[in-house]
Amino acid sequence: MNISNNARIDSNDLAKRGESLIRKSTNRYLTTVKIAFRAKQRRFDDFDGLLEESNIKPVQRSIIELSDEQDQPDLLPG
């Protein structure tokens, strides 16, 4: 799923991504905390003007990003 300004989030896809994150994790609590922490960072980045204007809520964006990182680790720098 590509994240863009005018993107509509498919709720079924978002639910599947969230379930996949939880299912593949060894600790549900830590995964939930990761999602919340990432969402909080995105929210503050939005306030600081570091991110483009977006209609996607920070929690939705963090689930999508973490799911992409989990499914495609070769895209990460390092």
Curated annotation (Swiss-Prot):
Database matches in HAMAP family: RNApol_bact_RpoZ
Swiss-Prot/TrEMBL catalytic activity: RNA(n) + a ribonucleoside 5'-triphosphate = RNA(n+1) + diphosphate
Keywords carried by this UniProt record: DNA-directed RNA polymerase, Nucleotidyltransferase, Transcription, Transferase
Pfam family, one: RNA_pol_Rpb6
Function according to Swiss-Prot or TrEMBL: Promotes RNA polymerase assembly. Latches the N- and C-terminal regions of the beta' subunit thereby facilitating its interaction with the beta and alpha subunits.
GO BP terms in the entry: DNA-templated transcription
Broad enzyme group: transferase
InterPro entries: DNA-dir_RNA_pol_omega, Pol_omega/Rpo6/RPB6
Domain of life per record: Bacteria
GO molecular function: DNA binding; DNA-directed RNA polymerase activity
One Gene Ontology cellular component annotation held by this UniProt entry: DNA-directed RNA polymerase complex
Signal peptide stretch: none
Family label: Belongs to the RNA polymerase subunit omega family.
Protein name from the UniProt record: DNA-directed RNA polymerase subunit omega
Keyword Nucleotidyltransferase: yes
Subunit-structure text: In cyanobacteria the RNAP catalytic core is composed of 2 alpha, 1 beta, 1 beta', 1 gamma and 1 omega subunit. When a sigma factor is associated with the core the holoenzyme is formed, which can initiate transcription.
EC code(s) of this entry: 2.7.7.6
